[in-house]
């Protein structure tokens, strides 16, 4: 069980940072916040997400925090830590919410002061909208929480991350290496966003919205996207994503070839395979 006497600090009160702050506060933890936007900080204060917070002159909040949640983009997290990381006190264990770990975990762990531990994690939840105003809409219960420990992490740090996920409401918690995580994310998350975005960009006929059905809406739900965040995540994980795009393109070309050849058997074979794999996937979904 997490110690409720510990002070938590959320740096970056966006969608996920705001949700962490909300759930921790609801669970009875003392949570402070740091945010660049005064408006979003005030929203978090007024709605009880945080007990206190600042947009600047926040060194004291950092120094007294027992645990920190970084709701920042990877580049911003590294930059922030280079400036303020020395303020973290011995015994502080902190984590992030970033969707990419390669290029982030090793540099931040190398910058940690003595006695400070960074245990990286990824809450695989979110919405098409962003900002703390929509944080309450995020549902952690059906989502996956992935912990990505390295040889520099302690059993206590890993256990803290697991217990944090439980307090936040995650039902499925697992561990992967940094490399495994980024390979997996390239397929199950980033490729899906790449397909949705490409589908929306492939046709500019705005009148199509009058005729679309559920299939189009389902496939393009995630195409309404945070451009700055996803551009950064794509570029940070570009080798894995390019590999997945190539593999997807190969499958699409296989279907195209079947159409050109009027190969009904091949099309039916692909449809059966996708149906079988989707059925198996549905059985494995966490309840």
Label the predicted regions.
Residues 58-88, 92-93:
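Rossmann-like NAD(P)-binding element
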């Amino acid at each position: 069980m997490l110690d409720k006497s510990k002070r938590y600090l959320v740096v970056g009160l966006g969608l996920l940072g705001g949700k962490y702050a909300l759930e921790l506060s609801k669970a009875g933890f003392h949570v402070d916040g740091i945010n660049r936007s005064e408006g979003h900080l005030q929203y978090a204060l007024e709605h009880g997400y945080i007990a206190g917070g600042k947009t600047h002159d926040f060194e004291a909040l950092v120094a007294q925090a027992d645990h920190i949640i970084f709701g920042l983009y990877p580049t911003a997290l590294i930059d922030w830590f280079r400036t303020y990381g020395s303020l973290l006190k011995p015994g502080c264990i902190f984590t992030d919410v970033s969707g990419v770990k390669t290029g982030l975990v090793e540099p931040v762990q190398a910058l940690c002061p003595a006695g400070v531990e960074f245990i990286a994690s990824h809450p695989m939840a979110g919405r098409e909208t962003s900002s703390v105003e929509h944080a309450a809409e995020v549902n952690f219960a059906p989502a996956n929480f992935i912990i990505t420990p390295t040889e520099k992490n302690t059993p206590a740090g890993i256990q803290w991350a697991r217990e944090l996920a439980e307090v936040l409401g995650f039902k499925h918690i697992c561990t992967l290496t940094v490399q495994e995580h980024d390979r997996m994310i390239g397929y199950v998350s980033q490729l899906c966003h790449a397909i949705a975005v490409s589908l929306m960009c492939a046709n500019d006929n705005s009148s199509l919205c009058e005729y679309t059905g559920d299939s189009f809406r389902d496939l393009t739900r995630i195409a309404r996207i945070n451009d700055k965040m996803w551009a950064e995540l794509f570029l940070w994980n570009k080798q894995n994503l390019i590999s997945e795009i190539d593999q997807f393109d190969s499958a699409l070309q296989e279907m195209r070839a079947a159409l050109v050849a009027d190969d009904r058997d091949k099309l039916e074979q692909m449809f059966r395979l996708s149906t079988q794999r989707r059925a198996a996937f549905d059985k494995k979904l966490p309840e």
